[in-house]
């Protein structure tokens, strides 16, 4: 079920530009101008050379570095992120831990989804 939720969640950012803008703003605040890094550098291996993410304290907050992934050459020019997808996966898998370990991300996720038009 995680994969289905993850892939369906990508459509939220794609179909609602305001959600993508909110994701970019959250990432900007969370990473504080840090550089894009290869996902292979962040997690070891297994990703294509062009897959990049912003380092943050994802792991220390119970999450995964993949949450910082963006699609594009920069955050400003990103056409998608992984925030909604990985956030929804985590919310469904471990809601109590998500709240306890990264309330900031959970609050971003809930408020962003709540603000979407019906």
Predicted regions, residues:
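Active-site-flanking segments in enzyme catalytic domains
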Residues: 1-118
């Amino acid at each position: 079920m995680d994969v289905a939720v993850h892939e369906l969640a990508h459509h939220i950012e794609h179909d609602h530009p305001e959600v993508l803008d909110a994701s970019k703003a959250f990432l900007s605040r969370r990473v504080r101008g840090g550089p894009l890094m290869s996902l292979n550098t962040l997690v070891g291996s297994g990703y294509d050379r062009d897959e990049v993410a912003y380092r943050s304290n994802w792991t220390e907050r119970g999450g995964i570095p993949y949450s910082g992934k963006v699609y594009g050459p920069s955050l400003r020019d990103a056409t998608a992120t992984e925030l909604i997808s990985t956030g929804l996966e985590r919310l469904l898998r471990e809601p109590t831990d998500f709240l306890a370990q990264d309330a900031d991300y959970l609050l971003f996720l809930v408020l962003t989804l709540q603000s979407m038009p019906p």
